[in-house]
Every structure is written in structure tokens, then in C-alpha cells.
From Swiss-Prot:
One of its GO terms (molecular function) is enzyme regulator activity. This is Penicillin-binding protein activator LpoB. A lipid is attached at residue 17 (S-diacylglycerol cysteine). HAMAP family: LpoB. GO terms for cellular component: periplasmic side of cell outer membrane. Residues 37-46 have a biased composition (Pro residues). A lipid is attached at residue 17 (N-palmitoyl cysteine). Pfam families: LpoB. Belongs to the LpoB family.
Amino acid sequence: MKKMLFVVAAVFLLAGCPSMLPQQPPAPVEPVTPTEPTEPPKPIEPPIEVVPTPPKITSINWNAAIQPLIREMSVTDDLATGKLLVVDNVKNNSGGNIQAVNATNTIIDSVNSISALQTVPYAQMMSARKALGLSGEDSLGLRSAAIGLARYLQADYILFSTVDGKKDNRVISMQLMSVASGEILWSGRHKVE
């Protein structure tokens, strides 16, 4: 009997539950009448930032400063014809932008055209710097690193160049050093204009 009572109670309970949810009437659709297009609001523009102007790069006539020094160096008595020369990157101690790469390239071109020495080719120089763990752009600040690089390249001489002074009074200094002895064979200075 308990089973029967339980079945009847379950039937009444289930019969009382609605099987479908009550439906709501659909929302009324209102027709939209076209209106004249209005001008959209203009976006607010951010304030204009003033970009600072970069420092002016002054054009330096490197040939005028370097060629007289290379001519002076080429008549040094201790230089042997056809020997190999490592040209170190020009070191900038002037505090300004002097385009040291252009100066280095001018030195290499001047040595190749004026002097009886031969410069180490650029590709060979870069591969040697990479093999020794030196950066390609850096000047070889330590003489020992420069001499090590020159010995690795089997060069006979190394030429160091430095630009000192302020904007209106810059001077380029060069020193030619023997790789074998470490002796400074020649040094010279010239005003950079």
C-alpha cells in the first residue's frame, strides 16, 4: 500500500508541474521613420607634442685633416714598403657627433692611395674582431687588445686615431705603432675643420 500511495503522490506532483513555460506576448514593433543625418560629433584630438630637434650633424671635411697626416706618416724612415697596417676605428673624445665611421673610412682610403702600406681588408678585420670577441664598431681602447688583433691578422703596424676638443677647436691625433716591438714610430696632430 505504501508503494501505491507513493506512486499516486508522484503522479499528482508531476501533473501539477507545468510542462511549458507561460508565453509572453511579443514586444511591439514600432516603425522607425528616417530622419535627416546629423553630423557625428568630432573626436577630441590629443594635444600636439613638440618633438625636440636632434643635434645638427656638422659636415666635416675629413680629407683636409687626414691626408696631410698620412703624407707626413708615409715619409717616416722606419716604414717598409708593402707592409700590412691595421687602422683602428677613430675614437671620439670630443663629446660631440663627429661621424667617426666617415673619419675611419677616410683614413683607410688615404693610406691606400698615399702610403706604401696596405690596410687590412674590412671583411678580414671584422671576422678577426668577431673571432677575438671584440665589437666591430668599438675603438680598440686598450693597446694590448689592438696589438693582439694586429698579431692575429699578422699585421706589421697599427694606426690609432683620436679626435679631441670642442666643436670649434677639434684636433685629430694619430699614432703609428709597430706590432712587433710596441714602439711608437710616428705621431701627428692636425686641426679638424
